[in-house]
Structures are given as structure tokens and as C-alpha cells.
């Protein structure tokens, strides 16, 4: 255990050393005038020498001069122009001075001896601005929409003949329910269902009236399994066929599944026949076809009607209306997945050196344990 701790400590020291080394490796030390001599008659004019070099932040200048008889002062531009030695920003007088250029912009240096300054012993150094590497533009990911999983719907119940309505012809005694809707996912219809009247049907023999249970809320753009052009009552209670002033169930306003341009369940991929008294599809658990709507236990289903034997005579009694269970049943909406936040990569020398140091440390540790 102690050997592992020693190895980890040694690796940390190596990492810190490499990070420090690489962080200061880019800094340069410049000898003023080429040889560092801070004198009145340099071999090359100080400003000419400065123009030939490129100074960056954290670089340094080395001044060498006679201690006690000369000095180096960092001053403002106005004091530089007038050789004012009484208001220095920094004053160096130890004979050998190293001045760090800790910012970008212009640095003004003059001799602390005013007579030397007036003879040209002054220097202007311009430090280049720090250039941050442009970061790559962050591309925000397109939010993906996860598909909703609709519940598997059972076939609608076999309908009973609608309540007696004023008609001009006798409704048939038997009717066959259309094929059950497919078990595929599709959006829920949200339009109210009303049974328009005075429309002729192309199905002369087998009209399928509304089922006994609440109208199935199938997740498909198809209309109700009943042969009416009404859409599935997803949010509003549908009117009973007893109130439809249509001529007869045979002449219901709906189109036949075989001839109607509407998206009838007869055109769905599923061809299993509907069985009587099977639970109707909905987003929530289906109720028994003989029981009333789950939200209105004391009222019958909105489309339940008497048997075919009572459809011969006109009736004025209306079937009590109850809201469809889909009004209170939450539907599955599209779920939007959160988008990951974009990452902006900024390259810095310290990060690169840290990675390199980590690699060196890992290699060293591996070699020690190997």
C-alpha cells in the first residue's frame, strides 16, 4: 500500500513539473539592444531593435547597466516623450533588471538619469495581443422525437341495431361489424363526432351502426367503426343514432368500408372479424361493452340502442348522453427527448501540456508496476 502511495505522489510531482515547464516554455527573454547593455550610445538604436522583434505576453526584457549611476524606469507615454523621471510607474536600479511584459500593448522605458534619457536612452516595446484560438461553432443537436407506443386495441364490439328513428325504410335485422382497426400506432383524431343526416350509403345490405360501448379511441386517422362519416369522438360526446334524422340505418350518412373514401377500418391491414361483446379500444383499460362509460357509471353508453326489433317504429325518446371515456383519458403525446448541450472546445497550451503530463505519468506508473 505504501509503495502505491509513493508511486502516486511521485507521479503527481512529475505531472506538476511538466505542467510548469510547458506553461513557461513559450516565454522568451530578450536582451535589450541585442546584448542587454543599457547605455547612452548603444550599438543599435533601441527602438530599431524593438521593431525587429515580436514580443508576446509573459516575455521579459533584460537590462544591464552601472548600478548607482543609471537605472531603468517604466513610465507613461507623456513622461516618455518629455523624459520626466519624477513620476515612474516602476523603477529598477539594481544594475541587472528583468522586466516581465505581463500584458499586451505598449511599454515605455527611459533611463533614470534625465540627461541620458535626453540623449536617446529610451525604449518603446509593443506587446502583441493574446490570440485565443477560435472555438469550433457549437452545433445544437436536433431534438429527436421518440415515437409513442399506443396500446394494443381489441376489436370493437358487435353493434346492435340503432334506436328507432323516423325513417322511410326498414333497417336490416342483422348487421356485421367491420373489421377491427389495425394494431398500429397513428395519431388520435380530435374532431367531434356528429352524425349528419340525409346522406345515402353505398352499403345496401349491411350497415354497421354504432357499437354498444363508447366509441373506440383508436390511434389511427380512421373514422369510427360505425358507418358514419363522423370522426372518432376523442374529446366531445357523440350523439346517439337515435337523434340522427337520417332516413334509415341502411341510408346512414356513412360510407361503406368497401366504397367509402373515408379511412374506414375495413381498409386496415387487420382482417379479423369483430366478436360480440369484446372490449372496445381506448387509451385506458377498456370497459365491458354491457357496462356504462367508466367516467359515468350511472349512464349508459353514448351509442347503446335498443334491439333491431324495436327499430321499426319511430321513437321520440332520446338516449342519455354520456361523455366518452377518451375525454378524461390522457393520450400519449409525442415525447421530446432533451438535447444534449453543445460543448465548446477551446485549445489552450496548459490543457495540452496537462494531457501530455498525464500520459507521461501514466507511462511512468505503468513501468514501475510492470
UniProtKB/Swiss-Prot annotation:
Annotated region described as Disordered, given as residue ranges: 135-347
Removed propeptide positions: 346-370
UniProt KW keywords: Cell membrane, Disulfide bond, Glycoprotein, GPI-anchor, Lipoprotein, Membrane, Signal
Biased composition (Pro residues): 291-305
UniProt cross-references to SUPFAM superfamilies, sorted A to Z: Cupredoxins (SSF49503)
One Gene Ontology term of the molecular function aspect: electron transfer activity
Topology in the lipid bilayer: Lipid-anchor; GPI-anchor
Positions of GPI-anchor amidated asparagine lipidation: 345
Tissue specificity note: Mostly expressed in stems, leaves and flowers, and, to a lower extent, in seedlings, roots and seeds.
Signal sequence range: 1-27
Function: May act as a carbohydrate transporter.
Protein family membership: Belongs to the early nodulin-like (ENODL) family.
Official protein name in the record: Early nodulin-like protein 1
This protein's encoding gene: ENODL1
Amino acid at each position: 500500500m505504501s509503495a502505491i502511495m509513493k508511486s502516486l505522489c511521485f507521479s503527481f510531482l512529475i505531472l506538476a513539473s511538466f505542467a510548469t515547464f510547458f506553461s513557461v516554455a513559450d516565454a522568451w527573454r530578450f536582451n535589450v539592444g541585442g546584448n542587454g547593455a543599457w547605455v547612452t550610445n548603444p550599438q543599435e538604436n533601441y527602438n530599431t531593435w524593438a521593431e525587429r522583434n515580436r514580443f508576446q505576453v509573459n516575455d521579459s526584457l533584460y537590462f544591464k547597466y552601472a548600478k548607482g549611476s543609471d537605472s531603468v524606469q517604466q513610465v507613461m507615454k507623456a513622461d516618455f516623450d518629455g523624459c520626466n523621471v519624477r513620476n515612474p510607474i516602476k523603477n529598477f536600479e539594481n544594475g541587472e533588471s528583468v522586466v516581465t511584459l505581463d500584458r499586451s500593448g505598449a511599454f515605455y522605458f527611459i533611463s533614470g538619469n534625465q540627461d541620458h534619457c535626453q540623449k536617446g536612452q529610451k525604449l518603446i516595446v509593443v506587446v502583441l495581443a493574446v490570440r485565443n484560438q477560435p472555438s469550433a461553432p457549437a452545433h445544437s443537436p436536433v431534438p429527436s422525437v421518440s415515437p409513442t407506443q399506443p396500446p394494443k386495441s381489441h376489436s370493437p364490439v358487435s353493434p346492435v341495431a340503432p334506436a328507432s328513428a323516423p325513417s322511410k325504410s326498414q333497417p336490416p335485422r342483422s348487421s356485421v361489424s367491420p373489421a377491427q382497426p389495425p394494431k398500429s400506432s397513428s395519431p388520435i383524431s380530435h374532431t367531434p363526432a356528429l352524425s349528419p343526416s340525409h346522406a345515402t350509403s353505398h352499403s345496401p345490405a349491411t350497415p354497421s351502426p354504432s357499437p354498444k360501448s363508447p366509441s373506440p379511441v383508436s390511434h389511427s386517422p380512421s373514422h369510427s367503426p360505425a358507418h358514419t362519416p363522423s370522426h372518432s369522438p376523442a374529446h366531445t360526446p357523440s350523439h346517439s343514432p337515435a337523434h340522427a334524422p337520417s332516413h334509415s340505418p341502411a341510408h346512414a350518412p356513412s360510407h361503406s368500408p368497401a366504397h367509402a373514401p373515408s379511412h374506414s377500418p375495413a381498409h386496415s391491414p387487420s382482417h379479423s372479424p369483430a366478436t360480440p361483446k369484446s372490449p372496445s379500444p381506448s387509451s385506458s383499460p377498456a370497459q365491458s361493452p354491457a357496462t356504462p362509460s367508466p367516467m359515468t357509471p350511472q349512464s349508459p353508453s353514448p351509442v347503446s340502442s335498443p334491439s333491431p326489433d324495436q327499430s321499426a317504429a319511430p321513437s321520440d325518446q332520446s338516449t342519455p348522453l354520456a361523455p366518452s371515456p377518451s375525454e378524461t383519458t390522457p393520450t400519449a403525446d409525442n415525447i421530446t427527448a432533451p438535447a444534449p448541450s453543445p460543448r465548446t472546445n477551446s485549445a489552450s497550451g496548459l490543457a495540452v501540456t496537462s494531457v501530455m503530463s498525464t500520459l507521461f505519468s501514466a507511462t511512468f506508473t505503468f513501468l514501475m508496476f510492470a
